[in-house]
Amino acid sequence: MSNNQNINNEDSDRLLDIVLTALDDMKGVDVRVIDVRELTSITDRMVVVSGTSTRHVKALAEHVVLQAKQQGYKPLGMEGEATAEWVLVDLIDVVVHVMMPEIRDFYALEKLWSVGGRNDASDNASA
């Protein structure tokens, strides 16, 4: 692995830590990290988290964006905040899916992206 790849991995790990801390700060529920580096070139990791209401979903997503910006990361975009049943925050190396529990159950992203790949499936925040 080249030095540039090491720096990129360290940066990606730092961004993931920022995201997980932000979700923990706002009491995100059932936080899961899915390592998709071997499955796609779109992103390194996906984080899936539930909110307890649409207001909570939106607040979680906004807090992730705010914390990332404060640490010097520029989000590529955020989608879904109008209905706030599923808000996607694209931080390039980390994509965050903040979902209402019923939407999360229906789409089952953890199962979809962990088939044939490595799923960290870690509880990184308390419920």
What kind of region is each of these model predictions?
Residues 1-38, 52-59, 71, 80, ...:
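Long, contiguous binding/interaction regions
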Residues 33-42, 76-93:
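Glycine/charge-rich, flexible interdomain linkers and switch-proximal surface loops
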Residues 55-76, 88:
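Compact, glycine-rich, soluble single-domain proteins
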